[in-house]
């Protein structure tokens, strides 16, 4: 049964159920509980599955971990803490995993110090395991297994078939899925849902599932995605903690010019960057979102040019952050941001999720973020603390984006969120997991189908559809052999069983697992050997020695290339090229598109009825939080 948490527990009631050391630590750090903590900690303590939806800075991550740390502490104090994984934390980003690791360090270290003062010895281990984890570290995890394992969906699927480490997962009691809203509507989420059911099957007892999400809709659907179904087809129990609208916000849409229609593109571009620069000057730290990596590089370059000409900001106070920059470059930017060394940071999507980046007092969105949910997620990065206002400015440079943003803000203030659409019955993902299950052990067909149907994404999978995938994977389509596609499993139709085929299938599985498309990237190095980031092969083909381009907000001169490596040197002469990256467009959400159509219809109706321009523009200013320039452009 899916239900909503209604009862808010007092601080005393919550701390009473926690280990005394955890309670003492909490009281020394926080004056009171946040709304999600008042609603969620007791249900987690009572071993209920919980979905928490709340804005950034509301303490939902700590909410998830408090009970877990408390229970592990109880076991440690009884000398009952075994060498196995008790809690699995899953997030879509490696950077977020590293962030959580660092954020757990402080409470675990401070609680350990409190225990030492009382003559108690505790040792709760936590570790990150992703594709970046060295093999030596993975080997160490077998000997000293982390009690809290921090990982990604893809790595979880890999360790489920790791012969030795999978045994460490049998004792898992808690599973935390962070940023579940970003996973649920993609095939990565479908992939994860099957991994969770395979982990459920492996574990000695049914693990408690905790989902953490920013603003999302509908919550009941996401809850069913998180917890799955029992063998009778009923949703497992889940308590929803809905604190989505607890934080105040201030969002407005503006146009940098009075006339968006006839102004020359060059003049519009100039006014845009001047407006952004003006906002950056007025605020302590500004986070600027573009919708593409190319846009990020372009904005950083022009802001640095303005800083150089005006002299009111230093060029090094402006930085870029996106997925095509090297990990070291991104970490350096994040560190500077946390330390308050940056006035402006420009990102495409890489800072959308909950990475801890310190204090942001305003978010600027250039163009349309294409959905109400994404808009609120981005704006929510400002005013990180609970009592602060999330402040956002949406700047538009064409009328279509302007209308999108105006409608988006109107819907955001009315709490009308886009509905999430969770993919169903993705057979390519199913094929991967059938191979993974075959690697684990020999399966009865009906038993395997039962496990798969527990996933929300496959609850409607028919047996015939399942058998067709088995037929494909077992190589029974003889025509595929002409294309060198061979069977990965064996399937005995009479016995109703299947299992792994060949000794290399584990390698094939781990190398081809996941749903993130492969990108053929060219790695960019300085001539001194420093890794800067990636560019597309197509962009490299257009470069000749001496060409200049921007990467990470810095200008480089192309020297030469060898294979998929490009070598560059810093350049100081300007007029560089902006690299382009493939598949960068964000899709417009269906629900928002419908609302935009209705808004345009209403505008046309009022104009045809002879409603005065002043009244129409006044409506846009009031309801859509638009400035006069934006209202004028929408009317025209």
Which sequence ranges carry the predicted segments?
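Conserved nucleotide-binding/hydrolysis modules and their immediate coupling elements
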Residues: 475, 481-601
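Ser/Thr-centered flexible coil motifs
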Residues: 19, 34, 265, 326, ...
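Pre-P-loop entry segment of helicase/translocase ATPase cores
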Residues: 1-36
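Terminal, basic amphipathic appendages of nucleotide-handling enzymes
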Residues: 9, 24, 414, 519, ...
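Phosphate-interacting basic helix/loop segments used at nucleotide- and nucleic-acid interfaces
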Residues: 272-275, 337-338, 342-344, 348, ...
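Conserved lysine of the Walker
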Residues: 60-61
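The conserved Walker
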Residues: 54-56
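Helicase motor core with emphasis on the C-terminal RecA-like subdomain
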Residues: 6, 11, 21-22, 38-39, ...
């Amino acid at each position: 049964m899916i239900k909503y948490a209604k009862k808010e527990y007092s601080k005393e009631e919550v701390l009473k159920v926690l280990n005394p050391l955890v309670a003492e630590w909490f009281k020394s750090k926080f004056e009171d509980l946040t709304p999600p903590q008042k609603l969620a900690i007791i249900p987690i303590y009572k071993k209920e599955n919980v979905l928490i939806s709340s804005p950034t800075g509301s303490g939902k991550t700590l909410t998830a971990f408090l009970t877990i740390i408390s229970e592990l502490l109880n076991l440690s104090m009884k000398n009952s803490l075994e060498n196995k994984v008790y809690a699995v934390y899953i997030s879509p980003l490696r950077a977020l995993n590293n962030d959580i690791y660092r954020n757990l360090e402080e409470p675990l270290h401070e609680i350990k110090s409190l225990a030492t003062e009382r003559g108690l010895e505790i040792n709760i281990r936590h570790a990150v395991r992703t594709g970046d984890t060295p093999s030596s570290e993975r080997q160490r995890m077998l000997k000293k297994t982390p009690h809290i394992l921090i990982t990604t969906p893809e790595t979880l699927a890999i360790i489920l078939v790791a012969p030795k480490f999978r045994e460490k997962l049998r004792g898992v009691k808690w599973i935390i899925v962070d940023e579940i809203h970003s996973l649920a509507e993609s095939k990565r989420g479908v992939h994860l849902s099957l991994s969770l059911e395979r982990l459920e099957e492996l574990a000695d007892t049914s693990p408690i599932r905790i989902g953490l999400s920013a603003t999302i809709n509908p919550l009941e659907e996401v809850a069913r995605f998180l917890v799955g179904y029992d063998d009778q087809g009923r949703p497992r129990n889940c308590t929803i903690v809905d604190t989505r609208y607890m934080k105040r916000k201030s969002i407005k849409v503006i146009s940098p010019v009075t006339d968006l229609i006839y102004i020359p593109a060059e003049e519009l571009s100039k006014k845009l960057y001047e407006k952004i620069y003006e906002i950056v000057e007025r605020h302590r730290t500004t986070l600027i979102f573009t919708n593409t990596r190319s846009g990020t590089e372009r904005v950083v370059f022009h802001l640095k040019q303005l800083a150089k000409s005006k002299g009111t900001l230093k060029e090094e106070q402006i930085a870029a952050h996106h997925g095509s920059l090297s990990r070291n470059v991104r970490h350096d930017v994040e560190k500077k941001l946390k330390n308050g060394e940056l006035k402006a940071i420009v990102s495409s999507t890489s800072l959308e999720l909950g990475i801890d980046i310190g204090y942001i007092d305003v978010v600027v969105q250039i163009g349309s973020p294409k959905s109400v949910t994404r808009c609120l997620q981005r704006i929510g990065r400002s005013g990180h603390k609970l009592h602060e206002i999330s402040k956002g400015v949406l700047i538009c440079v064409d009328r279509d984006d302007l209308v999108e943003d105006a409608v988006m803000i109107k819907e955001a203030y009315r709490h009308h969120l886009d509905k999430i659409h969770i993919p169903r019955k993705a057979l390519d993902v199913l094929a991967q997991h059938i191979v993974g299950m075959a690697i684990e052990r020999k399966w009865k067909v009906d038993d395997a189908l039962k496990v798969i149907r527990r996933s929300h994404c496959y609850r409607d999978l028919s047996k015939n559809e399942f058998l067709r995938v088995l037929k494909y994977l077992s190589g029974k389509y003889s025509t595929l052999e002409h294309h060198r596609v061979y069977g990965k499993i064996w399937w005995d139709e009479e016995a109703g069983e299947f299992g792994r085929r060949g000794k290399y299938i584990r390698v094939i599985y781990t190398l081809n697992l996941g749903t993130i498309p492969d990108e053929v990237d060219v790695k960019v190095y300085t001539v001194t050997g420093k890794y800067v980031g990636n560019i597309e092969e197509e962009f490299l083909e257009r470069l000749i020695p001496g060409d200049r381009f921007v990467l990470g907000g810095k200008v480089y001169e192309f020297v030469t290339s060898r294979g998929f490596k490009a070598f560059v040197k810093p350049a100081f002469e300007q007029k560089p090229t902006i690299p382009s990256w493939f598949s960068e467009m964000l899709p417009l959400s269906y629900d928002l598109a419908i609302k935009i159509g209705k808004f345009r219809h209403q505008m046309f109706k009022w104009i045809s009825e002879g409603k005065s321009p002043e009244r129409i523009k006044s409506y846009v200013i009031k309801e859509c939080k638009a400035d006069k320039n934006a209202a004028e452009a929408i009317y025209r």
